[in-house]
Amino acid sequence: MSIRPLHDRVIVKRKEVETKSAGGIVLTGSAAAKSTRGEIIAVGKGRILENGTVQPLDVKVGDIVIFNDGYGVKTEKIDNEEVLIMPESDILAIVEA
């Protein structure tokens, strides 16, 4: 299935978080926090400004990002994979190699 977000929305596939503590203890359940890093897998066309022009997004498909996992983030299952749909404003940073 193909999915295309609208306007300033992006679709992110969450990256797996390390499940071991610094001391080597395997974390489970609530002790294993969900990662706030992910890969952009789709982007909308951009934010519509008051004058009607479209401002392109700063992120692109393939970017690794750090995001705010909060109120505006919607979790969906696409082709048996969990993805996150969020506005670009919930992205805090792009991880550069």
UniProtKB/Swiss-Prot annotation:
GO biological process, one term: chaperone cofactor-dependent protein refolding
GO-annotated cellular components: cytoplasm
Compartments, record wording: Cytoplasm
Domain of life: Bacteria
Molecular functions per Gene Ontology: ATP binding; metal ion binding; protein folding chaperone; protein-folding chaperone binding; unfolded protein binding
Pfam families reported in the protein's UniProt record: Cpn10 (PF00166)
Keyword annotations: Chaperone, Cytoplasm
Annotated SUPFAM superfamilies: GroES-like
Stored InterPro entries: Chaperonin_GroES, Chaperonin_GroES_sf, Chaprnonin_Cpn10_CS, GroES-like_sf
Gene3D superfamilies the record matches: GroES chaperonin (2.30.33.40)
The protein's role, per its UniProt record: Together with the chaperonin GroEL, plays an essential role in assisting protein folding. The GroEL-GroES system forms a nano-cage that allows encapsulation of the non-native substrate proteins and provides a physical environment optimized to promote and accelerate protein folding. GroES binds to the apical surface of the GroEL ring, thereby capping the opening of the GroEL channel.
Similarity annotation: Belongs to the GroES chaperonin family.
Subunit: Heptamer of 7 subunits arranged in a ring. Interacts with the chaperonin GroEL.
Name under which the protein is recorded: Co-chaperonin GroES
Annotated source species: Klebsiella pneumoniae subsp. pneumoniae (strain ATCC 700721 / MGH 78578)
Taxonomic placement: Bacteria, Pseudomonadati, Pseudomonadota, Gammaproteobacteria, Enterobacterales
